[in-house]
């Protein structure tokens, strides 16, 4: 008998295990997304590329929202992103607002907005212009 060591039958020169996330260059977990797609009964079978693509899309959306929220936090002279910054980031971006239009963010507040009819009228003109208008 030969080679009864711990290597078990692996060929010499085998590589270390590498996750599908690292193969795809992603931070989001491809294996977890694949498991959730299988368990969610979305389809009978799930292809090998679908969880990689979905994880990449989720990672892109998260990065986009966090970048805009970080800008909102910096505008408010804060170093920590809070739900208010997420709300401002999403509602001020046209595409994200369309995507997440019906989403409620807890502790997010509302966008500052004063209707034009409620603002005071500008009166910087003299009486001459008033007589000309009539």
From Swiss-Prot:
A motif ([ST]-Q motif) lies at residues 131-132. GO terms for molecular function: DNA binding; protein heterodimerization activity; structural constituent of chromatin. Its main location: nucleus. Keywords: Acetylation, Chromosome, DNA damage, DNA repair, DNA-binding, Methylation, Nucleosome core, Nucleus, Phosphoprotein. The record marks 121 as: Not ubiquitinated. It is found in: Nucleus; Chromosome. Gene3D superfamilies: Histone, subunit A. Residues 1-25 are annotated as: Disordered. The modification N5-methylglutamine is found at residue 107. CDD domains: HFD_H2A. Core component of nucleosome which plays a central role in DNA double strand break (DSB) repair. Nucleosomes wrap and compact DNA into chromatin, limiting DNA accessibility to the cellular machineries which require DNA as a template. Histones thereby play a central role in transcription regulation, DNA repair, DNA replication and chromosomal stability. DNA accessibility is regulated via a complex set of post-translational modifications of histones, also called histone code, and nucleosome remodeling. Belongs to the histone H2A family. The [ST]-Q motif constitutes a recognition sequence for kinases from the PI3/PI4-kinase family. In contrast to vertebrates and insects, its C-terminus is not monoubiquitinated. The nucleosome is a histone octamer containing two molecules each of H2A, H2B, H3 and H4 assembled in one H3-H4 heterotetramer and two H2A-H2B heterodimers. The octamer wraps approximately 147 bp of DNA. This is Histone H2A. It comes from Chaetomium globosum (strain ATCC 6205 / CBS 148.51 / DSM 1962 / NBRC 6347 / NRRL 1970). The gene is HTA1.
